[in-house]
């Protein structure tokens, strides 16, 4: 979870237009993107951290994770 949270921090630093959050509801992790006007979108959801990580990497590429290491 720590690496995933660091990746979210780097996504928020690199993407000045949007903010990204992970929340947990009913046992599922939900990745949410919120734009500068306050509108939010569910980008993806999964029941484990590994799948959320794959969603982030699938959408934004490995750059987000490499910048954290």
Where are these regions (language model features)?
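Acidic, low-complexity, intrinsically disordered interaction modules
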Residues: 17-63
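Negatively charged, low-complexity tracts enriched in Asp/Glu with abundant Ser/Thr
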Residues: 1-17, 63-69
């Amino acid at each position: 979870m720590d690496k995933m949270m660091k990746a979210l921090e780097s996504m928020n630093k690199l993407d000045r237009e949007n903010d990204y959050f992970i929340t947990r509801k009913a046992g599922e992790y939900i990745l949410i993107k919120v734009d500068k006007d306050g509108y939010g979108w569910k980008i993806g959801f999964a029941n484990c951290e590994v799948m959320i990580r794959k969603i982030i990497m699938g959408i934004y590429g490995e750059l987000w994770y490499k910048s954290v290491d």
